[in-house]
């Protein structure tokens, strides 16, 4: 439900409509060229009917950027604002508009409070940053209250490519390496959580890996088994 495309993408795709004419219109008209379903739930449902879709899982683009804000309080404030917006959007039809909230975990009590609020708002999942702030790790038991809150509320954790509390400001020459190695970050998170017993302590915890590819899974599973043996 949120329209926020990087400038490089707007030149290639005009809010979901391919073609040079549409791209030129978006460059000329700005967001006035974007279809109404980008911000109106009523139009979004009509778009689903047009495209033969039963439902959509709605992710944030804004929070992927806001998670890079170093100031913890400001970053969390951005998460709250988005969660309020998303809750209002999905309220139109929660069966067909499935919301995923967003949260940062720098301050564990604040994170637990926001996770519980996300569940009360009717969301089905919560997006956490794949890369935490410097010095923090998903292997740290201090995050157990976060996993407990997520498990108790029935939310699903979404680990989306490109989400970081460590800051992302790569030089142009860095992009090929970052793009080719995007799966490494999610592997690191899963490895930390598996070998430190997070899933043993919270067997109901569910994780979704989003836009991190899947072809690496067989080899990753082999390497994990090899290490465990």
List the model feature ranges, each with a label:
Residues 1-229:
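Helix-coil boundary/capping segments in enzymes
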């Amino acid at each position: 439900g949120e329209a926020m495309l990087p400038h490089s993408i707007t030149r290639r795709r005009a809010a979901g409509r391919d073609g040079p004419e549409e791209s030129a219109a978006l460059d000329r008209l700005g967001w006035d060229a974007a279809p109404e379903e980008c911000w109106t739930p009523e139009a979004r449902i009509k778009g689903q009917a047009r495209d033969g879709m039963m439902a959509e899982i709605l992710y944030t683009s804004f929070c992927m950027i806001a998670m890079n804000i170093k100031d913890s309080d400001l970053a969390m404030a951005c998460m709250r604002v988005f969660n309020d917006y998303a809750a209002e959007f999905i309220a139109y039809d929660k069966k067909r508009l499935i919301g995923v909230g967003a949260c940062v975990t720098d301050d564990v009590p604040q994170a637990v409070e926001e996770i519980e609020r996300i569940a009360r708002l009717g969301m089905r999942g919560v997006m956490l940053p794949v890369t935490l702030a410097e010095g923090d790790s998903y292997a740290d038991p201090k995050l157990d209250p976060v996993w407990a809150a997520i498990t108790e509320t029935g939310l699903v954790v979404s680990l989306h490519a490109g989400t970081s509390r460590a800051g992302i400001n790569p030089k142009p020459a860095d992009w090929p390496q970052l793009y080719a190695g995007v799966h490494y970050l999610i592997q690191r998170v899963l490895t930390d959580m598996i070998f430190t017993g997070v899933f043993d302590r919270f067997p109901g915890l569910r994780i979704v890996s989003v836009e991190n590819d899947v072809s690496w899974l067989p080899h990753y599973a082999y390497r994990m088994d090899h290490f465990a043996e």
